[in-house]
Amino acid sequence: GGSCAIKYAENESVKPKAVFAIDPPLDFERFYNSAKRDIRLSKDRQANEENIYIIDRLEKETGGNPSTHLAEYYKISPYSFSDTVQTEIKKLSTIPLRVYTEPDINWWLKERGADFTSINATECSAMINELNKLGNEDAVLIVTQNNSYRKPDNRRHPHSWSIVDNAELIKWLLKQP
């Protein structure tokens, strides 16, 4: 959802007043490569089905992998770490943007065997940093801690919508001109 919201703000002629995203994957080149790596490192060659789906879907959407179709990955990504021109994020230089993330690396290591290369926090912070350097002072990264619980059973999971303070987010949205 968050990746789509950011891409919408980048590409549509009717611009939203503000955009927010909750721990979105932003760099689909990184997403593809981390899924490939996770499969390679999987225990007993039992690959996570989500990683297999991600690779298949991205190859269908782009016509191949990042090595052969990098320009297509740049087009579908809200942010691309390796795109030194950063065509896509320049379109966000005047739009207030909030990106929420809870990079609980110890949880990821223990529960999923994942490291920073497999989570979205790195590219979320990189995108906000680059937008700030482009002059967008209204681009903000909100990093939470111990807020991530999935409903209805309150299971701990850092990639959860519960990291957002809903009342505070609504106040922020309503304040946008």
Predicted regions and their residues:
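A short helix-to-beta-strand connector/capping loop
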Residues: K15, S93, N136-D138
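C-terminal catalytic histidine-bearing segment of alpha/beta-hydrolase fold enzymes
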Residues: L97-E111, S118-P177
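Active-site nucleophile elbow and catalytic-triad environment of alpha/beta-hydrolase enzymes
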Residues: H69-E88
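Catalytic nucleophile loop
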Residues: G1-G2
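Amphipathic, non-transmembrane alpha-helical secondary structure
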Residues: E10, Q86, A167-K171
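Hydrolase active-site cap/lid region
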Residues: I6-A71
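Short, proline-enriched alpha-helix->beta-strand connector loops that line the catalytic pocket
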Residues: K90-L97
